[in-house]
UniProtKB/Swiss-Prot annotation:
Origin: domain of life: Eukaryota
Name of the featured protein: Mediator of RNA polymerase II transcription subunit 10
Coiled-coil segments: none
Major location category of this protein: nucleus
Alphabetical list of InterPro entries matching this protein: Mediator_Med10 (IPR019145)
UniProt record similarity statement: Belongs to the Mediator complex subunit 10 family.
Subunit structure of this chain's protein: Component of the Mediator complex.
């Protein structure tokens, strides 16, 4: 069962390849689970179980040796979510929510400091008119460029 599909293009070839490797690995784990559950204790079932275990080890090894998997490290939190049986999309959603809250807080701080700069500059300009050009220079240098 896949939750999303990846379009095959020249730019994401390694991603598609890794996705296919992971899908094959998941299938092998499912088949291995079935073999373990249905194990009769016979030589034939032992051979099938050994073969499937070696296949899983081989697939894990090829996935680990892939350069693409080292290029994009997976956060430990995501692995913990998966190990706990939770959906890793929950981690992504929570990460985005925390980042949005942090960005909103920082934006509020920036706006507060801009207002402080403007009010302080106006008050200083009224009290010390001879500093007017320096105050305007500071305001101009500390005002973010609007694009």
């Amino acid at each position: 069962m896949t939750t999303a599909t990846i379009d095959s293009s020249s730019g994401n070839g390694p991603l598609v390849s890794t996705t296919e490797q992971l899908q094959g690995l998941i299938e092998s784990f499912i088949e291995l689970g079935v073999l373990v559950h249905d194990n009769q204790g016979t030589q034939q079932s032992h051979t099938a179980l050994t073969h499937k275990t070696n296949q899983v080890i081989s697939q894990l090894s090829s996935l680990t040796d892939s350069g693409f998997t080292h290029q994009y490290p997976i956060p430990v939190d995501v692995i913990s979510y998966i190990e706990d049986g939770r959906n890793p999309d929950v981690y992504t959603r929570e990460f985005v929510e925390v980042t949005a809250k942090s960005n909103a807080r920082l934006k509020g701080k920036m706006l507060g400091f801009q207002k402080l700069r403007d009010v302080l500059g106006d008050k200083l300009g009224k009290e010390f008119p001879e500093l007017g050009s320096a105050i305007e220079d500071i305001k101009k240098r500390t005002t973010p460029d609007e694009e």
